[in-house]
């Protein structure tokens, strides 16, 4: 399932004013993919078909001026990719050209449940990577404080 700009803006609108996306924000997108893997088995979770952001969201990612976006999927963007000429093309645009931090495989279930319960989708979030000199990616320990 390809998540489009329309899906993102509709979700923000449905969640209300505490879900407004502002410059510098870290946006979290929960698809339920990690929950499904826990329930049904890991199978092809890492490498198989998965919901994720459509390549068409690149303009929204840039125009919104967010600092980062993270999902509960293994690859952030929809798999299989929307066209065959490039592997994970949204990565190829978002990282070097937008300068966007991408988070993958984030466990968002407890946070999503808490947000739905109190109707507040705004919180302080930190996700410091382990310090590895010269690395282009590293595990993080995300912490949300409401």
Each language-model region and where it sits:
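Active-/binding-site microenvironments in catalytic and ligand-binding cores
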Residues: 1-146
